[in-house]
């Protein structure tokens, strides 16, 4: 390792999703994207706006003015008059990953604090924290319900030795396990002391229909993060946003990189919100497909599959080695799934993709997994 690099970076590995190299067409069901592209008419509108509105020799709007206004309009539908969001409540990032990094810098950098996560969960919280040299406190979940170990969580935030917890990440619904927060978990979040920031990741809000947005004004130590990469079909454009107390938002705006979101990404996200009724109309179909897959897999004796409030399913076999073999066999047949937390996370695709997933799973199970009684 080069002598000027921080020694702890030796533990960090580059992220290489969808490595390819198989020489065959693949169903990409490992990253929880929407299986449907932007409609052609919207792509054409975006192209027209690019020609009309973007000067390539000029930097993007560093304040995200139009995009924030569109986000505020979208949020106002969800708060239903309980409170009125404004642009001062919104920060925009180059994907939610940039927001995660800014949040960590704002709260925990320089030995100021550690991060609490309940695993399994979204891996980037721990990955980004480790690249910044920030300690991560990991607690578990119930292996059947996937509810957080709240006793361990309470112990973690009240301990007085070592670096105190200054930040807690939760996902609603969680990834990879697809379960929404329970009432007990929500009650625990409501009583987290004000010196700890609670980040509620609602990346899959449009699929679950569940949000804590209405409670945000009562909790200045809460931040809700969301993304355009899932239901709004803009994974290629890397747009995420956070909603929180104006003082918190001002701090995050101060430390993010300038011109962090390309002009075309801002145009695409604004257009997606303008056309949200069209784009979100696919969600009932995806939920129907999700529930169909769940019922099909539930009767397979070699698998344990959990109910989902999102656009993916999580399942396990009898052993981690069997699960790894199953993932490899699916890939060999042309279906990419995420092997994580000793299980498989399978994105809900188009009906044709889902049929292939079922067929490939059946072939792999027949070849390698003994039936259970």
From Swiss-Prot:
Pathway: Amino-acid biosynthesis; L-histidine biosynthesis; L-histidine from 5-phospho-alpha-D-ribose 1-diphosphate: step 7/9. Its EC number is 2.6.1.9. It is an enzyme of class 2 (transferase). Keywords: Amino-acid biosynthesis, Aminotransferase, Histidine biosynthesis, Pyridoxal phosphate, Transferase. Gene3D superfamilies: Aspartate Aminotransferase, domain 1, Type I PLP-dependent aspartate aminotransferase-like (Major domain). It comes from the Bacteria. InterPro entries: Aminotransferase_I/II_large, HisP_aminotrans, HistidinolP_aminotransfase, PyrdxlP-dep_Trfase, PyrdxlP-dep_Trfase_major, PyrdxlP-dep_Trfase_small. The modification N6-(pyridoxal phosphate)lysine is found at residue 230. It catalyses: L-histidinol phosphate + 2-oxoglutarate = 3-(imidazol-4-yl)-2-oxopropyl phosphate + L-glutamate. Its cofactor is pyridoxal 5'-phosphate. Disulfide bonds: none annotated. GO terms for biological process: L-histidine biosynthetic process. GO terms for molecular function: histidinol-phosphate transaminase activity; pyridoxal phosphate binding. Belongs to the class-II pyridoxal-phosphate-dependent aminotransferase family. Histidinol-phosphate aminotransferase subfamily. PANTHER family: HISTIDINOL-PHOSPHATE AMINOTRANSFERASE (PTHR43643:SF6), HISTIDINOL-PHOSPHATE AMINOTRANSFERASE 2 (PTHR43643). Homodimer. HAMAP family: HisC_aminotrans_2. This is Histidinol-phosphate aminotransferase. It comes from Synechococcus sp. (strain ATCC 27144 / PCC 6301 / SAUG 1402/1). The lineage of its organism: Bacteria, Bacillati, Cyanobacteriota, Cyanophyceae, Synechococcales. The gene is hisC.
């Amino acid at each position: 390792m080069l002598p000027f690099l921080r020694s702890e970076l030796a533990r960090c590995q580059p992220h290489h999703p969808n490595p390819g190299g198989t020489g065959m067409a693949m169903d990409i069901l490992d990253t929880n994207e929407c299986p449907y592209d932007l409609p052609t008419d919207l792509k054409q509108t975006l192209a027209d706006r690019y020609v009309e509105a973007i000067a390539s020799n000029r930097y993007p709007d560093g304040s995200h003015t139009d995009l924030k206004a569109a986000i505020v309009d979208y949020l106002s539908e969800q708060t239903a008059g309980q409170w009125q969001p404004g642009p001062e409540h919104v920060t925009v990032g180059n994907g939610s990953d940039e927001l995660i990094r800014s949040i960590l810098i704002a709260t925990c950098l320089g030995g100021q604090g550690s991060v609490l996560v309940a695993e399994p969960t979204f891996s980037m919280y721990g990955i980004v924290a480790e690249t910044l040299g920030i300690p991560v406190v990991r607690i578990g979940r119930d292996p059947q319900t996937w509810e957080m170990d709240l006793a361990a969580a309470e112990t973690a935030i009240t301990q007085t030795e070592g670096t105190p917890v200054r930040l807690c990440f939760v996902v609603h619904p969680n990834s990879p396990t697809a379960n929404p927060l329970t009432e007990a978990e929500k009650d625990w979040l409501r009583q987290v002391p004000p010196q700890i920031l609670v980040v509620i990741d609602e990346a899959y809000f449009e699929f679950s229909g569940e949000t804590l947005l209405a409670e945000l004004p009562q909790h200045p130590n809460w931040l809700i993060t969301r993304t355009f990469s899932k239901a709004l079909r803009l994974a290629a454009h890397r747009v995420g946003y956070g909603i929180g107390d104006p003082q918190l938002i001002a701090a995050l705006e101060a430390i993010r990189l300038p011109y962090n979101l390309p002009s075309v990404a801002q145009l695409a996200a604004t257009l997606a919100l303008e056309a949200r009724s069209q784009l979100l109309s696919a969600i009932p179909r995806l939920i129907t497909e999700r529930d169909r897959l769940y019922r099909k897999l539930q009767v397979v004796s070699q698998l344990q599959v959990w109910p989902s409030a999102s656009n993916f399913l999580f399942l396990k076999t009898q052993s981690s080695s069997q699960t790894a073999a199953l993932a490899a066999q699916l890939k060999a047949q042309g279906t990419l799934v995420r092997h994580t937390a000793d299980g498989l996370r399978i994105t809900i695709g188009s009906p044709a993709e889902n049929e292939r997933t079922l067929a490939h799973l059946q072939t792999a199970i027949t070849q390698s997994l003994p039936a259970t009684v």
